[in-house]
Amino acid sequence: MERKLIVDCITFDTSKDVINEAMSKGGPFIVKGILQRAGAKNQNGRIYPKEILERESNKYNENFIKERRALGELDHPESSVVNLKNVSHNVTKVMWDGDDLIGEVEVLPTPSGNILKELFASGIRLGISSRGMGSVKKNVYESADEVQDDFELIAFDFVSNPSTRGAFLYPKDQQSLQEGIVKNPETNKWENVENIIRDILGEIKS
């Protein structure tokens, strides 16, 4: 089976109190929330078996988190390699809560990280996206594509306009945790945010 780049988004929920505390202390800016979910069909029609996600999260912890190089980018990377020029954050911890993979993420003082920090501080809803290489196989019973054993987790990236509608980061006091489709004309507001981010990143690269 041919391996390909697999990108999926999940709702990432963090407390506004955590953001306010990080801003007031002036120390590391940390957010915490769900990074990925096992065993359930997502909005892209894919299922991640828990044993595969557990294996990959353990490898990610040993090979990247413990060595402090679990880096991620801002926006929608389309590469199997993390581009250091676009790095915005570093995952510092992962743990399981049932079928949910929970993570703590430190926003870094890089150009992209500073943009990410200001978006959080301004209350902008953001999404989290997992990036990996692997193959999928049709699961006829679930009417979904099941991620196969050759899957390899690469990174978690923050996105402004996720490919999965509803996969946004938002304070807990604004909305309950849901993975679904946002049927709201205000979506255009978030698309405008994405355009702004792309413009800023374009200026940084040039």
Which stretches of residues belong to each language-model region?
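Short conserved beta-strand and strand-loop elements enriched in small hydrophobics
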Residues: 62, 66-82, 128
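Short, flexible beta-strand-to-coil junctions
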Residues: 35-41, 75-78, 131-137
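A structural signal for short, hydrophobic beta-strand segments that form beta-sheets
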Residues: 9-20, 35, 81-93, 153, ...
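Polar/acidic, low-complexity leader/linker segments enriched in S/T/G and N/D
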Residues: 1-66, 180-185, 189-194, 199-202
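A short, polar/proline- and glycine-enriched secondary-structure boundary/capping micro-motif
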Residues: 43-45, 83, 113-117
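Acidic Ser/Thr/Pro-rich low-complexity disordered segments
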Residues: 45-49, 77-85
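Intrinsically disordered, low-complexity regulatory segments
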Residues: 205-206
